[in-house]
């Protein structure tokens, strides 16, 4: 109706900091300037409250929606990832969102929150949300607690030559982008993960191009990683590889783009998967699976992880890593925590190893 108005107000701790009123109309763009803006980051996850009020000609509220907003910027330049115009190193952990009772369904909202708190306690500033569309409440807690994430989709074993499967993926991906794009904690879109069949086929390349164009059309503000952790890339803003090499010397040699793949164009270079080390306890002895052998000596395990981190730190070209993984799941017993989220190790020691690489460059 022409006599209705939309009033948008932004609050900081209940204090009004910006407000604008406009006639109700489809497609209107509103700008709300905020003085002395407080930026969102994992270290200072500041959120503003925001309200949208539809009022009639007499100024009476007809409808009202309340939400929140985080102010932050992500971009890539000169082979680095930037958060709020500063280089930012991503210390990610792989989280597959499994739980002992509900499998892919978290038992409570508190469980989603706790996964983030435990990840931060272990020294990570974010996570790859691996092979799952995570609950909206997880993204809420990531916004609230300060935890960066990569948004992925479940496509393990998908055949891109199957037209129905490809169309379903594209449709679902659009829904996820539209649902989650306003979360400041999500900093990268990564729709595909290996192994997929026929990744060298023309139909797969077409699927990648379609996903990239759709993603950029809906959300041009975030980097796009076409095939996470593969080293096999078509059209990507981030160059990611996967290496579970346990030997630190050989691991260090693998930390570079594969010359046999598409030409590397100075994208931020990220280790999409590494680690996966098994610590054998009485709870994990049966059906144990991981990478690089099984450890029974805790000091030896810490030494292995630290040597891998040292290799990453010494490379000079790495913009982030993703350690496998947050918790044990089903047959995979290579988590920092057990399946029921109990710590396997001395968390202060684990944290000190992963935090050897600071999120931001140390200013001299």
Model-derived regions: residue spans:
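Secreted/periplasmic carbohydrate-active enzymes, especially glycoside hydrolases
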Residues: 1-141, 145-146, 172, 187-188, ...
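Substrate-binding/catalytic cleft of secreted carbohydrate-active enzymes
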Residues: 114-119, 126-345, 349-354
């Amino acid at each position: 109706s022409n006599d209705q108005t939309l009033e948008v107000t932004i609050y900081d701790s209940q204090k009004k900091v910006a407000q604008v009123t406009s006639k109700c109309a489809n497609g209107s763009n509103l700008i709300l300037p905020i003085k002395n803006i407080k930026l969102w980051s994992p270290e200072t996850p500041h959120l503003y409250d925001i309200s949208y009020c539809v009022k009639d000609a007499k100024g009476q509220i007809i409808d009202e929606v309340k939400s929140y907003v985080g102010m932050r910027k992500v971009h890539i330049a000169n082979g680095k990832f930037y958060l709020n115009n500063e280089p930012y190193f991503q210390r990610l952990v792989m989280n597959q969102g499994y739980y002992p009772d509900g499998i892919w369904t978290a038992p409570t909202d508190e469980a989603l929150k706790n996964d983030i708190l435990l990840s931060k306690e272990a020294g990570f500033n974010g996570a790859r949300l691996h092979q799952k569309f995570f609950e909206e409440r997880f993204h809420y807690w990531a916004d609230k607690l300060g935890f960066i994430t990569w948004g992925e989709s479940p496509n393990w074993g998908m055949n891109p030559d199957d037209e129905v499967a490809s169309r379903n993926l594209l449709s679902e991906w659009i829904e996820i982008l539209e649902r989650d794009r306003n979360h400041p904690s999500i900093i990268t879109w990564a729709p595909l993960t290996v192994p997929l069949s026929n990744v060298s086929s023309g139909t797969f390349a077409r699927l990648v191009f379609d996903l990239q164009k759709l993603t950029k059309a809906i959300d041009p503000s975030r980097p796009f990683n076409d095939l996470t952790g593969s080293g096999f890339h078509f059209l990507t803003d981030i160059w990611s590889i996967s290496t579970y090499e346990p030997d630190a010397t050989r691991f260090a040699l693998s930390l570079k783009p594969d010359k046999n793949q598409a030409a590397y164009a100075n994208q931020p270079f990220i280790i999409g998967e590494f680690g996966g080390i098994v610590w054998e306890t009485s709870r994990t002895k049966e059906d144990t699976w991981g990478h690089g052998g099984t450890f029974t000596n805790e000091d030896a395990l810490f030494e292995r992880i630290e040597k891998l981190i040292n290799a990453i730190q010494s490379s000079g070209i790495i913009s982030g890593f993703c350690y496998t993984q947050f918790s044990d799941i089903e047959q995979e017993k290579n988590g920092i925590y057990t399946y029921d989220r109990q710590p396997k190790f001395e968390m202060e020691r684990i944290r000190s190893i992963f935090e050897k690489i600071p999120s931001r460059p140390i200013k001299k």
